[in-house]
Amino acid sequence: MEQFNNFLILLDSNLSGSWWFPALLIGTGIFFTIYLGFPQFKYFNSALKIVSGKTKSTDQDGETTGFQALTTAMSGAVGTGNIGGVALAIWTGGPAAIFWMWITAIFGMTTKYVEVTLGHKYRTKLSDGSISGGPMYYIEQGLNMKWVAILFAFLMMITAIGSGNMPQINNIALVMNTEFSVPKLFTGLFLGVLLWVIIIGGIKRIASVASKIIPIMGLIYFGGALIILAENYQNIIPSFNAIFAQVFTGSAAVGGFLGASFAMSLKYGVARGLYSNEAGQGSSPIAHASSKNKSIDQGVVSILEPFIDTIVVCSVTALVILSSGVWTQKFDTNFSKTDMVILEGTYSDEKNIDGDYLYPKQINELNSYVQSLDSDVKEFSGELTVQDGNLITQNITILHSRSIAEDVTISDQDDSNLFTGILNVDNGKIIESVDLQGKSLVSSAEL
């Protein structure tokens, strides 16, 4: 399992974690924005009129209204990415990552406009009368590249099963288990049956359910967020300052957060932006293809999707996280081996009464280390002595979730009893199967 996880990390570092990913995604949006004359601004009011029904736009074929198609697409986009994804962007890239999520959304509005228009234009009416569309159709018919269309369809299927479903179901199951002691298997089976009942009814039932759930879900979420923002209203303006102040310089260390470079803010902001609104991913055109609207008008409607999803919902989430200050606070949590490393030497993020770090040089060194820059920080290799779950070995520091871990206890993975004995460590990683608990930053949802 660990080897498979390492493979996924390697794959991520060479795809969404590479320099060309934000360049290609934002670059494509910039190209279409300039080439088409800034349609995300020019047609924004038209999109509102079509969705509200003030402007009539109907085609003779189709199974859903423009609003139903929009909410169906948003039902896949709005979710874990808007909550856990935002928290993860801040955790890895600092507050400045939110700015790059906004940039991704602004240019993603044009990308969405283009892909949805094409997906609707090249849609196909199946023998049973249902409508099918998406990038695989315009790749095959418009570009005459059937093998690429087949590859896209296969990868989209994996994406739908993976990031489209697993994070949401997993996090619901975790919350239900943690807060209400509901077995994870029961939650998974219940949600699976519920989804089956909806999906078996086809696009009409999916669209009907989505058009009712999405507005209600939005109202409940905004209501809860506004309560938190009202309690922390004095920190709203400073939160915006934190986002804009270090956009091109990276985020400085604050609290338990060790800081993030400009490259990390850009990379993770763009990656989480895509995960949030799916602009350029190719999933939305499949949902929008069923609309009765004309192709160009449904493309106009789709402009609203990244705006609502990222500019509005993600911004509210970001303000809740930043204004409450929880992103710099350490919480009791179970440590993940992939997010943990043991270092040589003792490092401290302790502060004086003025809020300044007592050992700023150590923080700067750790800041460089977590950003994979040159530093004098060395990963520990050797043996650790543990007695009744407590580390006896001195002169080491445990990093977890990009923060200095505190109050660490170690237990057996098999029976959960406090561990006593010797642990072997190689390049900062514990070889034995043990569980570690303690205080550290948390990255919110498990994405």
What annotation goes with each model-predicted range?
Residues 325-447:
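Low-complexity, proline/glycine-enriched hydrophobic segments characteristic of transmembrane helices
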Residues 59-91, 118-122, 127-136, 140, ...:
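Alpha-helical membrane segments and immediately flanking helix-loop junctions
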Residues 1-80, 91-97:
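N-terminal alpha-helical transmembrane segments of multi-pass membrane transport
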Residues 107-115, 189-203, 214-234, 296-324:
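Selective recognition of specific alpha-helical transmembrane segments in multi-pass small-molecule
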Residues 24-48, 170-176, 183-191, 195-232, ...:
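Membrane-interface loop-to-helix entry segments
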Residues 39-65, 88-98, 102, 110-143, ...:
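Flexible loop linkers connecting adjacent transmembrane helices
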Residues 28-33, 75, 104-129, 135-199, ...:
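Helix-loop-helix module between adjacent transmembrane segments
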Residues 22-28, 65-73, 145-159, 190, ...:
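Select transmembrane alpha-helical segments in multipass membrane proteins
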